Amino acid sequence: MSPPKYHRLDPGQRREQILDAANTLFGERPYEDVSIEDIANAAGVTRGLVHHYFGGRKEVYIGLLERLGAQREQELRPPKGRSARARVADSVSRWLDWTDANRMIWLATISHGEDIADPEVRHVVGDLVRRAVALLASFHADVAEDSARLRYALECWTGLNRTATRRWLDGDTTREATHDLLASTLEHILRTFGAAPAPRPRTVPE
């Protein structure tokens, strides 16, 4: 087979081209069934060029995870100048819009990334969760005090988010039910776990 023909692009464009091809492949097949040669052929480049920009299949997958994570963070960013309840409802709605539009790759990567045995991939997935938690805390800092307690609750919410969104995309429930669950629980977490702890009563010496 003759090597694929490709046009000269700047490094950023070439990386995006390779990630776009990987996005399609990993959305259609399990991680283990996609090879560097598959990615190169889908992108219309040589294997050597994929190795040059990423190293190997794992690095391509990690690059894709990080790009999807950045897109997810953007969708969770609430609009300014609205009530806490309206911001939560809007960000959850935009999140569901994004996952619906990108369902195949989301189900294949972020939703199941923790199931991949490679420790580096699992670490990246865990880091994406921690980043999402930190951003959620910062997005709602005007109504919720950032603390270890709040971040613990938000990390649990991201697990609920993955499960609920997966069930909806699999057709087991409705979008409305998923939105209600995610928005109401996030609002409750911000209100309950983001509240400043009550001061302990002072002990009066006898």
Locate the predicted segments by residue.
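Amphipathic alpha-helical segments used for helix-helix packing
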Residues: 99-122, 133-137, 162-169
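Amphipathic alpha-helical packing segments from all-alpha helical-bundle domains
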Residues: 73, 117-143, 148-156, 177-191
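Short, hydrophobic secondary-structure boundary micro-motifs
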Residues: 107-111, 177, 198-199
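Hydrophobic alpha-helical connector segments
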Residues: 63, 77-104, 145-147, 179
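N-terminal intrinsically disordered/low-complexity leader segments
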Residues: 1-13, 194-206
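Alpha-helical DNA-contacting segments of helix-turn-helix folds
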Residues: 61-68, 109, 124
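Helix-turn-helix
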Residues: 17, 25-59, 63
